[in-house]
Amino acid sequence: LIDNNARKRIQSQQSDGETVHHASVNLKRIPGLDDLSDKALLGFLKVVVEINRDKQVLAYRSGKRLQHEGHDFQLRMGFGLHAGWGMEAVGSLQKVDATYLSPHVNMSARMEAASRQFGVAVLMTESFFELMSNEAQSVCRRLDIVTVKGSAQPMPIYTYDTFQNQEFPELLAPKNTDLSLASLLKKQADNYTTREWTTDRDLLQLRGLATPAFNEKFKEGINAYLAANWAKARQLLEECDKMMEKSDRGGDGPSQTILGYMRNRA
């Protein structure tokens, strides 16, 4: 994994009498990687918005054949974001396999799978989170500190809250331009600034339930949980769950997951 202290270093350890070298790369030294990381998260969030705005998708979801007990079918997607090194195009001059070899590819897949467990649309590792701009980090939420299969290193995980049980306004091109809507959206992406996190209507509407009061209470609850003060953590996380009753899950997925973990180990 990426060094948490953001330094390039070589560690040596003795294994069966041999010296094994482990290298970590400081990705923060790559220019423009903060914007690239911001755009990666922003792109996935826009996908979440569009599956709740597109007329064809909405019509498909409301079809009677897919209804269950009178409720419309829900379409949900999960995304995992991680950053690290990888080897591309493995092979020889005669044949190249267009694939990637890296443990970091597997880490992204595990984050995507864990997004369902935590009931969130996006799950990020600390390695990815630390590459983003301060503005993007400020609107994300730390959920837990976990270890994943294949790694013994505990790491924080983060999400951007998405309230999907709502209608998003239709996108229309301004009347005073000859550009198509697709061209305008591409231009907007090319001209990205960190102001998007506090001005973009879709993003603000998407995280509408994650109020400052909710974020502060969840932060206090997760800190109590990590400090093994589970009685206090239960009280705070139960309150957080109630504050998210209007969400498509009928509560807060991360709070429910952690409450379930504590309940099974009480």
What name fits each language-model region?
Residues V49, H71, R76-M77, W85-E88, ...:
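Intrinsically disordered, glycine/charged-rich C-terminal tails and inter-domain linkers
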Residues L1-K39, V49-P103, S127-S138, S151-Y158:
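Catalytic core of nucleotidyl cyclases, primarily class III adenylyl/guanylyl cyclases
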Residues G43, V47:
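Acidic, glycine-rich loop-and-strand cores that form catalytic or ligand-binding grooves
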